[in-house]
Amino acid sequence: MAAKTPAQWKTLFENEPFHRENYYTGPLGPDYTPGGTCLRLWAPTAEAVTVTLYHKGDGGAVLGTEPLVRGAHGVWSIWLPGEQHGRYYTFAVTVDGITRETGDPYTRAAGVNGVRSMIVDLARTAPSGWERDVRPQILPAQRAVWEVSVRDFSQDAASGVRPAWRGKYMAFTQQGTTLHGDGIHPTCLNYLKRLGVKYVQLMPIFDFSSVDEAKPLLRQYNWGYDPTNFNVPEGSYSTDPTRGEVRIRECREMIAALHAAGIGVVMDVVYNHTYRTENPLNNTVPYYFFRQNADGSFSNGSGCGNEFASERPMARRYLIDSILYWAKEYHIDGFRFDLMGLYDAESINAVRAALDSLPGGRDILLYGEPWQGGASQLHRYEANKANLAMLNERVGIFCDDTRDAIKGGCFDAREPGYVEGKPGSFWDIGGAVAAWCRSDRLPPHAPSQIVSYVSAHDNFTLWDKLLCVRYEKPEFTARDTVALAQNRLAAGIYLTSFGLPFMQAGEEFARTKKGVSNSYRSSPALNRLDWNRAEQYHALVDYYRGLLALRAAFPRLGSTDRRAPEALQFFALEQPLVGWMLPAVWGDGAAWSALCVFYNPTETTRTVSLPAGQWKLLSDGTSSSLWRGPSRIFTGKAALAPYSATIFGAV
């Protein structure tokens, strides 16, 4: 009998009887007990499946090869008696006469480079006190996300992190680090605690393929948006990638250390595609887990060669199982979906519902990029900005409208935004402040659906963007007083807006990548956090620190109630100034009965009229901590410095 063509597989997988016959709700992957381990693999199109066992994760002798037995719903299984912790294995799956060696799609541990799966007793990977680790209790007004790569966080020798831990999970556990070990200027975890961000978003930490874990890392670098094993931590971030249990333990230690500091952990998840099509999912059930064009070839909405078919029942189940695994076994506090527009809205809502079913699960954040990376075969009900109304109100989106309004478009280096004086952009600033709840452009179910930001790992850093707009040939390492003022203004806008504030690590100390807009595989030196800049630009760091604390002191800005932005009172001001007042909610613990905020994106001082009453100056264009002590009281009129956000509190 002739082998099926890719188009024939597509027809089969889009046939409802196939799903009815083969949908499976029982356990999959390795089920470990001290007395033995059961391996279960969903492979409904397979003619035969065998497992090969190894003592090591790479090389070494074969311990044996055994056949699996096919059961109901296309599930193959085998019982391996005796102690199996630390045993490595691969499957050989035969489909249409072609046999492919593969790892287990449900594996929780792996050998070097993730080629061989590993049976693991998770209890043995728990760091000391893990059973007492709990998610930090973070109020909505305290929420702010700081995005960083594990590698970038501590790669810089100036970080004060011990050499063996630089660029590793364990760097997050080292206490008391300072710049060059000077004992004065905090770095890494010590720095984060002082800054006041309450969530760290980690760029991909599940096992990816673009870094060879068996080789030194000095010249290797990649962000990691090229996953291989979705339920296994990345090995290059561990101190020993050859031992499968080490990466699990050290990843958990990192999370526990952040929790102990009162900081939640958001995981950047990239289920939308895999690094290559020869991966455990496609090797096990060819073509099932990935969308296909009419001719059966792989659809490429990710721009990376394939895209995950979240709408297919067992693919959706895999997605939900994996998310729940990380939430339960790693105590993850939030999930950021890369290219969320490549998922169907029903699947994303199902993920939200599954998280909500966990103890404390309603506090787990869920947001993503509401766009795609190319033309997709998912033509309706995408989890994108156009379908925001279809998403659960606690599924958020990165708001490029806010980003581009504040700092300018991200694809044209020289296109200005509001802070650089773009004409007419002030109209969109009002929309951004209200998290677009008072606009017909989106609108969201609730302000908390909007991730307000001006920089992330993609595109230019904020500092580089500001300099590109100002100069035809920027000097990215030069100090620029106007760009610094514009940086403060940008922060002053999104940190006083409704929604979830988000920032790229180092935005608060003028991080530069010297004009490189896509550094996903640039040098470690270019991508690392330059901790010397945190000291050189300490006044900018302090400005962010003060704004974060000020925001937390006025809880209404963090409201998840869709009606909250309706209380904003915008002033009729001379263009391009923007001003607004927001009353506090009685009894919410706000430090002031109202906030009054003005933005001035011009190069001249401007005078505005204040609402009736007395107003304490809380923050101006250079200091965001005036509210912490005695400050001037204003009535009538006030002057706004050039390129400034000025904040008053009613007294």
What name fits each language-model region?
Residues 120, 352-353, 358, 362-505, ...:
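Conserved alpha/beta catalytic core and glycan-binding cleft of carbohydrate-active enzymes
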Residues 43, 85-89, 630-651:
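C-terminal beta-strand-rich structural cap/linker in extracellular carbohydrate-active enzymes
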Residues 41, 91, 148, 202, ...:
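Conserved, mostly hydrophobic/aromatic
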